[in-house]
Regions:
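Short, flexible loop segments at boundaries between secondary-structure elements
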Residues: 271-275
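Membrane-embedded alpha-helical bundles of multi-pass integral membrane proteins
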Residues: 1-25, 30
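Juxtamembrane segments of multi-pass membrane proteins
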Residues: 27, 50-70
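Iron-sulfur-cluster electron-transfer modules
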Residues: 30-39, 61, 65-67, 74-270
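Short, charged/polar, low-complexity loop and linker segments
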Residues: 25-26, 47, 92
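Active-site proximal loops enriched in glycine and acidic residues that flank catalytic Cys/His/Asp
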Residues: 46, 54-56, 70, 112, ...
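Short cysteine-rich clusters marking metal-coordination/redox-active sites
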Residues: 42, 52, 98
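The canonical Cys-X-X-Cys-His
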Residues: 45-48, 52, 104, 108
Length: 275
């Protein structure tokens, strides 16, 4: 009852995003009862901060202080006000520094969903104010324009397949496996070795498989930094492309692709796949 039953780390989808007038959380009154219960549940043990990789590296993020600052405002009776959270209560730098790794949530004895709180405030910064950490805007532009975060030539995505005798999926043909390679395995030479090894395994298995020529970035990065609009556009494009083909299982090459395809795509119409 006190915790979400959805997968840990799942970012809530904004329904009918083009019709919304506000995005994320920018004022205290926008927090719901569960968010406020989380603030009150903090026992101030500091385990979240102790395991935060950004904090341990000397960065500006202190998960404990974020929750305590929000709790303090709540106890002072600010729940009905229109007080702006950033920078009055929480600094922009701390929100933008979060990697959304979830270590704080795993360690919290009260199971406070710290990352979700940060994500909601960061979504407001991204979609309402256009504020991102340094370098993020360029990465988002790359995903939108060429389908990968590094701005590399989309025509070179499958160059590493040369000589491997791997088929591109065709409509009307059934495949046991559709191999979702992902951007890292497609462009990074070290990760290409892993993808090639997986192809050898698939060939030895005797299963029919193919890759999808239209594959592009799953845009998980966009969602994590708060750019939900780009994420939804990219996701719907990927789902539409996947639905052209007949396959039993979708095999993801990396944990980021796996989590996105398995846990987040099902939020969208026709986004349910056996991953």
């Amino acid at each position: 009852y006190w915790q979400r039953t959805k997968p840990r780390g799942l970012v809530e989808k904004i329904d009918n995003i083009e019709e919304q007038e506000s995005f994320g959380i920018s004022r205290f009154g926008q927090f719901n009862w569960h968010d406020r219960l989380n603030f009150d549940a903090c026992v101030e043990c500091g385990r979240c901060t102790a395991v935060c990789p950004v904090n341990r590296a000397g960065g500006p993020l202190d998960p404990r202080e974020i929750i305590l600052s929000l709790k303090k405002r709540m106890m002072e009776g600010y729940t009905k006000t229109e007080e702006v959270l950033v920078p009055d209560v929480v600094s922009k730098e701390s929100l933008l520094a979060c990697t959304t790794c979830g270590a704080c949530v795993e360690q919290c004895p009260s199971r406070i969903e710290i990352v979700n709180t940060i994500q909601q405030m960061r979504r407001s910064l991204a979609l309402e104010e256009g504020q991102f950490a340094e370098g993020v805007a360029k990465t988002l532009q790359n995903i939108q324009s060429v389908g990968n975060p590094w701005g590399l030539d989309p025509d070179a995505r499958w160059a590493w397949l040369e000589g491997l005798d791997v088929a591109f999926a065709e409509p009307g043909v059934h495949y046991d496996i559709l191999y979702w390679v992902g951007c890292s395995a497609a462009y990074d030479k070290r990760n290409q070795k892993i993808a090639k090894a997986m192809i050898k395994i698939l060939k030895h298995s005797g299963l029919s498989f193919a890759v999808m020529q239209e594959e592009m970035c799953n845009a998980e990065f966009a969602r994590r930094v708060g750019e939900e609009y780009l994420y939804q556009i990219q996701t719907q494009t990927n789902i539409d492309n996947l639905r052209q083909y007949n396959f039993t299982r979708l095999l993801a090459a990396c944990p980021h692709c796996f989590n996105t395809l398995k846990n987040e795509y099902p939020e969208f119409e026709r986004g349910q796949f056996n991953v």
